[in-house]
A protein has these predicted regions:
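Structural motif
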Residues: 69-70, 84
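Short, compositionally biased
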Residues: 82-96, 100-106
């Protein structure tokens, strides 16, 4: 994540669209009437002042369904927890990884079993380290 430029949610940001109902993944059925309004910000963002959007740069997290070019939603108000996916700052660089917490030890785990280039990062007291925010959603282009 060398191009670390978060996109912040403004307090008046809203994106509302019509929710048409459920769609069957099997045999198609005729479209139903509009059931309700769907506000994507209300659905995807719990803490507007602490939520940011990032575009994924790289392939170290593909096994967690974070592919290059996807948008991740990161909430800084959520306390990190074991095995959460998070944007972390370590030694001057930002990265997104799965955070493994084992007692007082922290490891940043990549999720790409097909590429041995990505190895776990053991966080030590010598590292400059913070968990910047927890990933809450991934928005994918199909």
């Amino acid at each position: 994540m060398s191009n670390f430029v978060p996109h912040k949610i403004d307090s008046d940001t809203s994106f509302e669209s019509d929710l048409l109902g459920e769609v069957k993944a099997g045999f198609p059925s005729p479209a139903e009437d509009i059931r309700e309004k769907l506000d994507l910000i209300k659905l995807l963002v719990k803490h507007k002042a602490a939520t940011f959007f990032f575009r994924v740069d790289g392939v170290s997290m593909v096994d967690c369904d974070m592919d290059e070019g996807d948008i991740i939603i990161v909430d800084r108000a959520i306390d990190p927890y074991n095995n959460c996916k998070a944007v972390c700052f370590i030694d001057g660089e930002y990265t997104v990884k799965r955070v493994e917490m084992l007692g007082s030890k922290v490891r940043l785990m990549p999720a790409n079993e097909h590429n041995t280039k990505y190895q776990p990062i053991e966080v030590t007291p010598d590292n400059q380290f913070i968990i910047w925010g927890v990933v809450t959603y991934t928005i994918k282009k199909m």
